[in-house]
């Protein structure tokens, strides 16, 4: 059984922005009786995980939280939420499970922003092993190699019976056009703040969403593709752009 705990990470020590406060208010209103468990930088370092230590030293907060959320669920159990997740309905109906995961909007990858597990879950422990055995590394052109959804996919490859909820349950907001498509089963919205990406990538995401808001979808898709290639070339160079394109092609073939 999953305990009534909401784990979240905040490592910078800065005040919460208004968007985070809004999301946290939804947790308190709609999840009464749940304990909110903050994992700050000091508590994260105390895990002793090499990946966490390296990510904190480089102020890559989101990558530190990838490992910390797994550690929290494996050691204490509960539900992990990114601070840009807005809760719409109670999670009580999920607590009898050993774990729960959902798909990320539009990608068929496991959503890392919302997950839950009972303590000592073998599935969570298997994913956590990656972070325990690897030092932290980060380059924008290789980021897709070790983002949490891909680590989870690798860890769960031998768990064919793992149930994963459809994207509209936890991730109804489109990463592509920014639109939120709610359904009766939707429990929360991951707003994709993308604070972990480089500033140039964040600008590219904003421009792509602007294109989808201004043009018909086929036109926007074409223009967004051109924009993506141009942005990758500017930031990664020719070799990095080709490597990223090959990686995306390989991921597409695996689906």
What are these regions (language model features)?
Residues 1-65, 83-255:
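Glycosyltransferase-associated regions of secretory-pathway enzymes
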Residues 67-78:
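Small-residue hinge/turn detector
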